[in-house]
Amino acid sequence: MTPEHLPTEQYDAQLAEKVVRLQSMMTPFAAPVPEVFRSPVSHYRMRAEFRIWHDGDDLYHIIFDQQTKSRIRVNSFPAASELINQLMTLMIEGVRNNPQLRHKLFQIDYLTTQSNQAIVSMLYHKKLGDEWRKEAEVLRDALRAQNINVHLIGRATKTKIMLDQDYVDERLPVAGKEMIYRQVENSFTQPNAAMNVQMLEWALSATEGSKGDLLELYCGNGNFSLALARNFERVLATEIAKPSVASAQYNIAANHIDNVQIIRMAAEEFTQAMNGEREFNRLQGIDLKSYQCETIFVDPPRSGLDSETEKMVQAYPRILYISCNPETLCKNLETLSQTHKVERLALFDQFPYTHHMECGVLLTLK
């Protein structure tokens, strides 16, 4: 695979290999046959980052080969959305002959949505000021004249210049209902929007008919908690990153959801609060004991759950676990399978043509 060519004819084979690999990894836990969710074979990534290489009068996007570290020129990137590909060409054309925008530009980051909004962040090794802003506004207006709903941001050391805003609002059709998700520049969002919809719908299916409340750790911008709110009496969710919490609060209002409460704290701190080991000012006015959480949802970082959180989640009758690293999932299952059994297993091909797998498990108390 090269950045400008996807081996789409090999898609089925690479997905089949992942299915076999996941089944093998899950054999010790008596997991059922995985439900498999395919990705679009191209234009599936909604965000991408590129270094900018200056070559005489020319400049272009590059990425670095992960093995050799050699640079690879990238004029098109079929893994990314069609809007990113369109913007890649227009940004180079708009910057190439503009000294103010070109000088010491070293990276461009793209964030797009299925609702056809875009943020383009331009990163510099120089101070940015009014001259940069004026030229960037001209470029933005030229892009908008081509019916592109785009926002430009300039970044340098300790500097961030927003021409308009630093967010886009994604709209996703989830099980017959449109969900609005605010996505903030430089914050985590699911890279594969089509796969995100399938993950949300699978999580809804796995929690259908649930009793009681839902607890979610690592909720981000509320991606899962808001979609799952329709299956529970109430949802209590934790997140540590301030921009993500702010986005989650916006998303709660935008989707007219009244049964989700977001708390800004780490999963480890929440464990201490639930166990009565520590009191937190952030929890004033929230009666944790009033929640009857029968289900816990976790979507941890690649490192998986720490040992304290493992113990905590074992106290819940149902555990829904989305993993971006099946190896750490299996490590966690060595503990969780002592008390719970794997009811459902799903493979989400979030990153086609790579070794990476995203998967989900529903665990129920034995």
From Swiss-Prot:
CDD domains: AdoMet_MTases. GO terms for molecular function: rRNA binding; tRNA (uracil(54)-C5)-methyltransferase activity, S-adenosyl methionine-dependent; tRNA binding. The keyword Magnesium does not apply. The active site is at 324 (nucleophile), 358 (proton acceptor). GO terms for cellular component: cytosol. Dual-specificity methyltransferase that catalyzes the formation of 5-methyluridine at position 54 (m5U54) in all tRNAs, and that of position 341 (m5U341) in tmRNA (transfer-mRNA). This is tRNA/tmRNA (uracil-C(5))-methyltransferase.
